[in-house]
């Protein structure tokens, strides 16, 4: 019987040619409406290729305006252009929301060059020295993108940027490490030292939100890659572009498109209609990024599930930390995980708060503000509960 189900699902009529082309990680060959910004970035990096100097650039813009994809696309071209000029340059893209400590960012750089590099138990300074030695010994260059750096600096302070910009300089010789920082806006620069601040300040590429017609072009170019020919109705594209233009967010537009395709497949409709887009809209919330939920660590996921479940069950606006912690223990049991201690649970909550997934404030109850009240403001608790269960099942 299950064999039949398998075959049936495999043979099911689908509107997709390749749905993976709609996933947030996919880097399209062509970036629509970002030629000027790409050119600007190239101009900033010209001296790196011509004079073998180093560069620092900051890319800013709100959610889903193409910061990550611009940097990745640029990095690929930069490597190519350097190679054809006989320059050994590596581009590395690091997401600082995922690699959350200075140590793990630098270890990532080292490991890129040699996965077997012995780095356990060594401090970040030592590791960074190793990177510089490595680059020197091979006459090699490195451009690192520190993506979602604002979030990282808020949590860890300015040391990472400081070390990456200074280590080589302090040792004399050429600085072989260039940086592309990505952040929502420039405000995080204030917590960096004056010298670093000013280099970034002079090299800012600010990406605007996309208009409806720009979003339509982005959608159309992705539809050609991801869908079978002619299955997405033009009205559907217009509607999705309109909906997403309120935020100017291409990620939201592409997610709507993907879910609309899924809705069409669920009905074996063969075409993606505006009604499928409307259905999709009912289950996507641009306020919370899917990747943010997906990239949470296991116990952060369990904690978030506990918050969502508590709020969904109680139907109240707020949940108290003590109650959520009890729910967390139940959730852990359900997923056969050993619950972590109170202090760690506390840290998970703080991190969820920092990511903007939950909102925490003092309850006014208990001693010295020990009790906090937690709310979920951006999405229905019921929706979040289901999402978290889905993600935890995938593990
Ligand atoms: N100009 C574009 N052409 C084609 N696809 C694009 C373009 N801009 C964005 N996208 C796509 O939209 C999605 C979101 O883009 P991206 O991840 O680069 O946004 P972001 O600015 O980094 O957002 P965040 O601040 O949330 O990290 C990705 O799937 C990306 O491929
Ligand atoms: Mg990004």
Question: Residue spans of the language-model regions?
Answer:
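AAA+ ATPase "lid" subdomain C-terminal helix
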Residues: 245-250, 258-272, 311-314, 332-333, ...
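Terminal-proximal interaction/regulatory segments of ATP-powered molecular machines
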Residues: 311-395
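Short alpha-helical segments that sit at the start of domains
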Residues: 286-318
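Walker A/P-loop nucleotide-binding motif
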Residues: 52-75
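Conserved C-terminal helix/linker of AAA+ ATPases
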Residues: 264-288
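Mid-core helix/loop region of P-loop NTP-binding domains shared across ATPases and GTPases
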Residues: 2-16, 54, 97-218, 226-244, ...
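A short, basic N-terminal segment
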Residues: 1-55, 77-80
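Conserved catalytic segments around the Walker B and adjacent sensor/switch elements
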Residues: 56-58, 81-97
């Amino acid at each position: 019987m299950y064999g039949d189900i398998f075959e049936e699902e495999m043979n099911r009529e689908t509107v997709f040619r390749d749905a993976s082309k709609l996933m947030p990680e996919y880097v399209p060959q062509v970036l629509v409406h970002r030629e000027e910004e790409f050119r600007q970035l190239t101009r900033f990096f010209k001296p790196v290729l011509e004079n073998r100097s180093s560069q620092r650039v900051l890319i800013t813009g709100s959610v889903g305006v193409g910061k990550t994809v611009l940097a990745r696309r640029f990095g690929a071209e930069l490597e190519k252009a350097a190679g054809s000029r006989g320059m050994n340059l590596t581009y590395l893209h690091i997401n600082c929301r995922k690699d959350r400590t200075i140590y793990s960012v630098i270890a990532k750089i080292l490991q890129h060059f040699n996965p077997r590099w012995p780095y356990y138990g060594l401090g970040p300074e030592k590791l960074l020295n190793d990177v510089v030695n490595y680059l020197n010994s091979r006459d090699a260059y490195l451009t690192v993108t520190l993506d979602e750096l604002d979030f990282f600096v808020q949590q860890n302070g300015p040391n990472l940027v400081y070390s990456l910009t200074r280590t080589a300089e302090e040792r004399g010789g050429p600085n072989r490490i260039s940086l592309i920082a990505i952040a929502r806006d420039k405000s995080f620069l204030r917590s960096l030292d004056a010298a670093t601040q000013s280099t970034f300040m002079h090299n800012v590429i600010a990406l605007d939100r996309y208009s409806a017609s720009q979003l339509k072009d982005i959608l159309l170019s992705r539809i050609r890659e991801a869908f079978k020919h002619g299955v997405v109705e033009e009205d559907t594209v217009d509607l999705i572009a309109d909906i997403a233009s309120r935020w100017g967010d291409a990620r939201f537009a592409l997610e709507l498109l993907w879910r609309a395709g899924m809705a069409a497949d669920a009905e074996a409709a063969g075409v993606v209609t505006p009604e499928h887009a409307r259905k999709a809209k009912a289950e996507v919330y641009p306020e919370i990024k899917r990747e943010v939920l997906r990239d949470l660590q296991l116990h952060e996921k369990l904690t978030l599930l506990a918050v969502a479940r508590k709020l969904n069950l109680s139907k109240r606006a707020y949940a108290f930390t003590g109650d959520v912690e009890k729910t967390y223990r139940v959730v852990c049991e359900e997923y056969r995980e050993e619950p972590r201690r109170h202090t760690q649970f506390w840290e998970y909550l703080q991190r969820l708060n920092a990511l903007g997934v939950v909102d925490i404030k003092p309850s006014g109850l208990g001693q010295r503000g020990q009790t906090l009240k937690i709310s979920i403001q951006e999405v229905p608790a019921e929706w979040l509960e289901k999402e978290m269960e889905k993600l935890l099942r995938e593990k």
